[in-house]
Amino acid sequence: MSERLVTSNEIGIDSTNEYSLRPEKINEYIGQDKVKERLNIFIKAAQRREEALDHVILYGPPGLGKTTLANIIANEMGGNLKITSGPAIERAGDLAAILTTLNTNDVLFIDEIHRLNRSVEEILYPAMEDYVLDIIIGKGAASKSIRLDLPKFTLIGATTRIGMLSSPLRDRFGVLCSMEYYTDEQLKEIIIRSAEILGCHITEEGAFEIAKRSRGTPRIANRLLKRVRDFAEVLYDNEITEEAAKKSLEILEVDGEGFDRIDNKILEAIIDNFNGGPVGIETLAYFVGEELDTIEDVYEPYLLQKGFIVRTPRGRMATDKAYKHLGRVRFNESKIDSKQCTLFEK
């Protein structure tokens, strides 16, 4: 199965030119204005006091720039960035090995921090509060505890599921930042900047055409830019115009809403096979030819967020936006009662 261009999760193509496209300083970072404003104040205050920045949680959907912000914080504080993830830290010793390599003002970035196990979390508590590491040497009656001092560092945790963080861990973060989806204009700025770095000429109209199909996500915007650049180099004299972007993305099967073939197949199944719904998720997965979990976790969230489908107690239903998007006419005049719908019912 080929990798999905409009997924917000990281895929192979994202590693190409990844670091060159990332801003290094906070004033170069586009979007997330409220987060930037707060972090800028906290960073300057920490610098004036000659202290480490307080520990930070960045939470929100994938692909919105959490790792980039962590790198910027490390640069602004004059430290190095060390990156790991919750699933990669299996034992307390794994975390201890990382903590003992840190220097003053370094930033330890833990992606998917909600997936840390509890024994690892317990090592983090004194490290975050008192900058000390308690380790046990030996076993049984002969064991003894040793306390090691750690340099003043900043822990940055990233999560897509803030509610899954344990209360003791969450309470130890002094700065909580909610990452929001980007506007089309912000994504256009990011695309123009990235195109310049990649050495590809792009018009504002071409950048906007890519931006509006990028699902509010910089990772997707840069990914689509790289693919459209290929078309531009071969077919359009290395220039991404509005027309070049539109035709390239049509070939890539990414439509004007940022939907791909499966997104549209889901809408078509609900409307054409079930008269707009309601239809159960198991039945829908069968008609689309995808796993149930894939429908729920990968495709459905964006369709819900954009208002193209709704969840009701009896199943999924297509909205008027979905009918209009597919050029269909709703023959059933009954409207969906929003009071009977919820985004959280299965």
From Swiss-Prot:
Quaternary structure and interacting proteins, as annotated: Homohexamer. Forms an RuvA(8)-RuvB(12)-Holliday junction (HJ) complex. HJ DNA is sandwiched between 2 RuvA tetramers; dsDNA enters through RuvA and exits via RuvB. An RuvB hexamer assembles on each DNA strand where it exits the tetramer. Each RuvB hexamer is contacted by two RuvA subunits (via domain III) on 2 adjacent RuvB subunits; this complex drives branch migration. In the full resolvosome a probable DNA-RuvA(4)-RuvB(12)-RuvC(2) complex forms which resolves the HJ.
Family: Belongs to the RuvB family.
Entry superkingdom: Bacteria
Positions of the UniProt region annotated as Large ATPase domain (RuvB-L): 1-182
Biological-process GO terms, alphabetical: DNA recombination; DNA repair
Enzyme class, UniProt record, top EC level: hydrolase
Region (Small ATPAse domain (RuvB-S)): 183-253
Segments passing through the bilayer: none
Domain characteristics, as noted in the entry: Has 3 domains, the large (RuvB-L) and small ATPase (RuvB-S) domains and the C-terminal head (RuvB-H) domain. The head domain binds DNA, while the ATPase domains jointly bind ATP, ADP or are empty depending on the state of the subunit in the translocation cycle. During a single DNA translocation step the structure of each domain remains the same, but their relative positions change.
Enzyme Commission number: 3.6.4.-
SMART domains recorded: AAA
Region (Head domain (RuvB-H)): 256-346
Binding site for Mg(2+): T67
GO molecular function: ATP binding; ATP hydrolysis activity; four-way junction DNA binding; four-way junction helicase activity
Localization per Swiss-Prot or TrEMBL: Cytoplasm
Task of the protein: The RuvA-RuvB-RuvC complex processes Holliday junction (HJ) DNA during genetic recombination and DNA repair, while the RuvA-RuvB complex plays an important role in the rescue of blocked DNA replication forks via replication fork reversal (RFR). RuvA specifically binds to HJ cruciform DNA, conferring on it an open structure. The RuvB hexamer acts as an ATP-dependent pump, pulling dsDNA into and through the RuvAB complex. RuvB forms 2 homohexamers on either side of HJ DNA bound by 1 or 2 RuvA tetramers; 4 subunits per hexamer contact DNA at a time.
Keyword line: ATP-binding, Cytoplasm, DNA damage, DNA recombination, DNA repair, DNA-binding, Hydrolase, Nucleotide-binding
Residues noted as binding DNA in the record, renumbered to the chain: R311, R316
Chain sites annotated for binding ATP: L21, R22, G63, K66, T67, T68, E129, D130, Y131, R172, Y182, R219
Catalyzed reactions: ATP + H2O = ADP + phosphate + H(+)
Pfam families xref list: AAA_lid_4 (PF17864), RuvB_C (PF05491), RuvB_N (PF05496)
GO cellular component assignments: cytoplasm; Holliday junction resolvase complex
HAMAP family found in the cross-reference section: DNA_HJ_migration_RuvB
Native organism: Clostridium perfringens (strain ATCC 13124 / DSM 756 / JCM 1290 / NCIMB 6125 / NCTC 8237 / Type A)
The protein's name: Holliday junction branch migration complex subunit RuvB
PANTHER family for the chain: HOLLIDAY JUNCTION BRANCH MIGRATION COMPLEX SUBUNIT RUVB (PTHR42848:SF1), PTHR42848
